[in-house]
């Protein structure tokens, strides 16, 4: 089996359907004997350029291990799903399981904001 990295851009109006879509795609992969090594939901982000007059999209990243048949099924599912405005499937040499740079940056941002709030609360208690 080969390793793949998949990025999916979902129409922002369909963000509520993302968990169901992810579940459907994961079940497609697992039914055929594949594995999902990493799944990240990057949320709604600004696009670099508009796609079909849409300026934002809901981003998903998946790293999977499967055979070519599953990839063909996923490509067809992406193509015929109106909520998916773009998809990219890349072949990788090995499985990638660590967090992406985008998720690491988001985690650092959350921790630094929490530290800032704690520091402000401590300062207000002293005053």
UniProtKB/Swiss-Prot annotation:
Keyword entries, A-Z: Ribonucleoprotein, Ribosomal protein, RNA-binding, rRNA-binding
Protein name: Small ribosomal subunit protein bS6
Origin superkingdom: Bacteria
Record family assignment: Belongs to the bacterial ribosomal protein bS6 family.
Record keyword Hydrolase present: no
Stretches with biased composition (Basic and acidic residues): 107-119
One GO MF term: structural constituent of ribosome
UniProt region (Disordered), positions on chain: 102-127
GO BP annotation list: translation
SUPFAM superfamilies in alphabetical order: Ribosomal protein S6
Keyword S-adenosyl-L-methionine: no
GO cellular component, one term: cytosolic small ribosomal subunit
Stated role: Binds together with bS18 to 16S ribosomal RNA.
């Amino acid at each position: 089996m080969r390793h793949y990295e998949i990025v999916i851009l979902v129409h922002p109006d369909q963000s509520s359907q993302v968990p169901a879509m992810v579940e459907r795609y994961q079940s497609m992969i697992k039914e055929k004997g594949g594995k999902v090594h990493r799944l990240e939901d990057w949320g709604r982000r600004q696009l670099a350029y508009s796609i079909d007059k849409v300026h934002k999209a809901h981003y998903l990243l998946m790293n999977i291990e499967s055979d070519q048949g599953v990839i063909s099924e996923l490509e067809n599912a992406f193509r015929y799903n109106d909520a998916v405005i773009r998809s990219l499937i890349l072949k990788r040499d090995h499985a990638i399981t660590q967090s992406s740079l985008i998720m690491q940056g988001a985690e650092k941002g959350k921790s630094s904001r929490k530290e800032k709030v704690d520091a402000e609360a401590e300062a207000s208690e002293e005053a």
